[in-house]
Structures are given as structure tokens and as C-alpha cells.
Regions:
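N-terminal non-catalytic cap/leader segment that marks the start of a structured domain
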Residues: 1-119, 294
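A generic local secondary-structure boundary/capping motif
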Residues: 4-5, 83-85, 113-116, 140-149, ...
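Short, structured patches in soluble enzyme cores that scaffold and shape functional sites
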Residues: 7, 128-130, 137, 144, ...
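Catalytic-pocket segment enriched in acidic/His residues
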Residues: 12-13, 57-61, 77, 83, ...
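Residue "hotspots" at secondary-structure boundaries inside conserved domains
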Residues: 86, 92, 147-149, 260, ...
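A short secondary-structure junction signal
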Residues: 105-108, 136-139, 144, 166-171, ...
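A gly/proline- and charged-residue-enriched helix-loop-helix capping module
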Residues: 116-137
Length: 310
């Protein structure tokens, strides 16, 4: 099931589920369809769906079957015209760093021996503030003092139930679904910060976290390692990889960061594959983002996250 969070013309948050009608994809507005059908209660928001567990999912699937059979324009919204929101309300995101093997290797300038020595026992990363997250089709301003403006397509895991290091819970079962994340980065600031062993400002300028548009529920992904992610700038392919190149897998990241105590709606991002501008040869400046660029970040089976640089 593919889930969307968007808002109506009046500004109200809507929960939408993707369905096909007349050869096109539409969003079933869950609240509107439920109001017409009546009967069993269905979640009114993305967070209610996530927190409601299996019962909420079953009720939503039942409503989707009912609505899809009728295809009434009253509850069908066009994804090309809605105003998107981030897939979950404002949440900070735990971001893994150097977690794809080939990206880790390119970051060490091809030195496999040095690359193998980097944090091989557990995932490391940083926190991206919730206020940086922006939805599908957002315009993101390149900061005035940033020229080395980079992209990083990633998969963000959406946590579906509370989990911490004290609970005997299968980490994979805590994953509600997957969405697309673009970890925009100011490399000048990031590299200066990394000289002091930290990353903060270089990852946390306003708008540096495009995310969405959909959450694909975990039950629709039988083999997460087969997920393919890619990124294009102005139609040019820059990044492409499947998740078999991950160093720490989805469940391993959830298990490790559950030490924080994860709750429904929390986000964990995988890190990015090779192909970032920072390591482009011969000159990274040829690939850094600039005003006027259109960035498409995609995950096969989930969709495309579009961002415009201004």
C-alpha cells in the first residue's frame, strides 16, 4: 500500500492511499470515502494509521477495496495537483553515514584498506532536524554562502512501533514502511565540521531534507535489499544502486538506533550510494547544485521525489 499525506484547498491534512482508475494513479481521500461508506472506523491521519497497527491497516485496506470499486470523484484526488506535505509530521531523522560500500570507497579516494577500517562494527551518522524536512515539489534555496551544494538520494525507514534496547522485538517488524529522502548537504561546512569530528550545520540549513512523496508499507516490500534508488539532476543520471551495497542493513540500523528509544513515526535514513558531486572527477563543481536545477530522487516501486533549487 502506498500512502500519501497532503492538504486540501482549505488547508486540512488529508490521508490518501494510491489507487488506479482509468489507467492512472489517484489518491483515495480516506476520510471522504469513509464518510460516504459509513461503518467501521478508519484512521483519519497518517500518524493514526501508523500508530493503529494491524487493525488500522486492515480497516484502511478494506475501505480502499470499497472505494476502488466505485471510483467516485468525490474522494479521488489527482496526485499531480494536490499540495504535498511531508510523509509524517515534523520529525528529526537519524542519518547513517558512509553506509553504502561503493560510496564509502569513493569517499576514501578508492583506498579499500582505509575504507574497511571506517566504523566497521556499528553504524555511525548524525541527526537532521525535523525543521529541515520539506515535501515533494518543494523549492529549496541554496544558502548565500554555499557553492558546494550536494545531493544524496537515500531510503528513509518509517518506524511503526515503539522499540528500545530493552524490548525483545524483531527490529525488522518495527519498520512500518519506506520513503524517499534527499540528504542535501553544504560540503564547505560539512568538511570543516568533520575536521573537528562532528557534522551539524552542513546538513541542517532550511530545506535540506526533501522527503516523500509516498510511504510504501513494509508488507509490500518482500526483499528490501532489492530496492533500487537513483537520482537525476536536470535529467542526467548521477546515482544508481540497489540496497545489496548497504554495509548495515535496515534491521541492523533499527536495532542500533533503538538505543535512543524509537517511537512510531520516527525516521532512519540509510546513507547514500556512490555518485555524489563531492567525489565527481575531474571537478566536483561541474556537478554541484545551482539555482535552476531540477532534482529527481527515486526508488523503484515507491515513486519520484522532485525538488527545485532556487
Amino acid at each position: 500500500m502506498k500512502i500519501a499525506r497532503y492538504q486540501s484547498a482549505a488547508g486540512a491534512e488529508r490521508l490518501g492511499i494510491v489507487t488506479a482508475a482509468s489507467g492512472r494513479e489517484f489518491l483515495v481521500d480516506v476520510a471522504k470515502a469513509a464518510a460516504v461508506r459509513g461503518g467501521p472506523t478508519t484512521p483519519a491521519s497518517v500518524m493514526a494509521l501508523i500508530e493503529g497497527g494491524a487493525a488500522a491497516m486492515d480497516a484502511t485496506r478494506d475501505l480502499l477495496r470499497w472505494a476502488a470499486d466505485r471510483q467516485d470523484p468525490l474522494w479521488l484526488d489527482d496526485p499531480n495537483t494536490v499540495e504535498w506535505l511531508t510523509p509524517v509530521p515534523e520529525k528529526s531523522i537519524f542519518c547513517a553515514g558512509r553506509n553504502f560500500g561503493r560510496h564509502k570507497l569513493e569517499s576514501m579516494k578508492g583506498n579499500a584498506d582505509n575504507a574497511s577500517k571506517l566504523h566497521s562494527d556499528f553504524p555511525t551518522g548524525f541527526i537532521k532536524l525535523g525543521r529541515t524536512l520539506v515535501p515533494h515539489k518543494s523549492q529549496v534555496k541554496r544558502p548565500d554562502d554555499v557553492l558546494d551544494f550536494d545531493y544524496e538520494v537515500e531510503i528513509a525507514l518509517v518506524i511503526g512501533k515503539a522499540i528500545d534496547a530493552r524490548r525483545d522485538i524483531d527490529p525488522a517488524s518495527a519498520i512500518f514502511g519506506y520513503t524517499i529522502f534527499n540528504d542535501l548537504s553544504a560540503r564547505e561546512w560539512q568538511l570543516r565540521e568533520m575536521q573537528n569530528g562532528m557534522i551539524m550545520l552542513g546538513k541542517n540549513f532550511p530545506g535540506f531534507g526533501p522527503i516523500g512523496p509516498y510511504i510504501l508499507t513494509a508488507d509490500a516490500v518482500p526483499d528490501p535489499k532489492a530496492l533500487v534508488l537513483w537520482l537525476k539532476v536536470n535529467g542526467e543520471l548521477r546515482q544508481h544502486s540497489d540496497c545489496r551495497d548497504l554495509i548495515f542493513g535496515f534491521a541492523e540500523m533499527v536495532a542500533f538506533w533503538s538505543r535512543f528509544g524509537l517511537v512510531p513515526g520516527d525516521l532512519i535514513s540509510t546513507g547514500t550510494p556512490e555518485g555524489v558531486a563531492l567525489h565527481h572527477k575531474p571537478d566536483p563543481r561541474e556537478w554541484y547544485l545551482k539555482p535552476g536545477d531540477r532534482v529527481e530522487a527515486g526508488i523503484d516501486g515507491i515513486g519520484v521525489l522532485e525538488t527545485f533549487i532556487v
